[in-house]
Design a protein with these regions (language model features):
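Short, flexible, mixed-charge acidic loops at enzyme active sites
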Residues: 46-51, 189-197
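N-terminal juxtadomain amphipathic helix
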Residues: 1-60
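Pocket-edge positions in alpha/beta enzyme catalytic cores
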Residues: 14, 67-70, 142
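Conserved SAM-binding loop
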Residues: 74-195
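Charge-dense, low-complexity intrinsically disordered segments
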Residues: 20, 65, 69, 156
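Conserved class I S-adenosyl-L-methionine
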Residues: 40-85, 104
């Protein structure tokens, strides 16, 4: 039996390219995805903006200021969530951005490692946590190194190949380790209210 898909929304990239994209839902598993997906070779251009908040430390406009205030609150909540499963140890943040979460973890006594594909954000993260343990890929980390906790905060929706990525992350997790994943909830109230203008798209 063939998998059936349903056209959901047409959304626009107002930040960088101005392009529009179709969001399609799998009727079987309810996964919502961009169709067609941008080619891997072209994906980086959608993040090449000084206004892409996750890759910047600048606070030049109201949106950035609000984002930073909210981020301070969420960082504490994230650490509290992790402490329910692990009190301390090693942690890898996949898609660490400019390293704010890693810095919070480091101050709490964790051994921190980050993975970030964007060179500029990676450099900022390394300076922020005063460590060389910020890598462009999991493949750059020592072959046998595994972690007590792996986090991926709103990263997987940006990944081109989902299953292989999760498989790679699982290989880096200790046997009794914890993996925490957060993705946008397209069934949320704000998603249903704002529809194609929702920030999660």
């Amino acid at each position: 039996k063939f998998t059936e898909f349903k056209n959901e929304l047409i959304v626009t990239d107002y930040l960088v390219t101005g392009e529009s994209f179709a969001l399609v839902k799998c009727k079987k598993c309810q996964l919502l995805f961009t169709n067609p997906r941008p080619e891997p070779i072209n994906i980086s251009k959608y993040y090449e903006s000084e206004d892409y908040i996750s890759h910047q430390n600048k606070g030049t406009n109201l949106t950035n200021i609000i984002y930073k205030l909210v981020r301070r609150i969420t960082l504490k909540k994230k650490c509290k969530l992790i402490s329910k499963y692990q009190e301390s140890g090693s942690i890898m943040d996949f898609g660490c951005g400019t390293g704010d979460f890693l810095l919070t973890c480091k101050k709490a006594g964790w051994q921190v490692t980050g993975v970030e594909v964007d060179e500029g954000a990676r450099s900022l993260a390394a300076k922020k946590i005063e460590s060389e343990n910020i890598f462009a890929s999991t493949e750059n980390i020592k072959k046998n190194q595994k972690f007590d906790v792996i986090t991926a905060w709103h990263v997987l929706e940006h990944v081109h190949e989902l299953k292989p990525t999760i498989k790679l992350l699982k290989k880096r997790l200790k046997k009794d380790g914890t993996m925490i994943i957060a993705v946008p909830n397209y069934l949320s109230y704000d998603s249903n209210y704002y529809k194609e203008f929702w920030a999660g798209y």
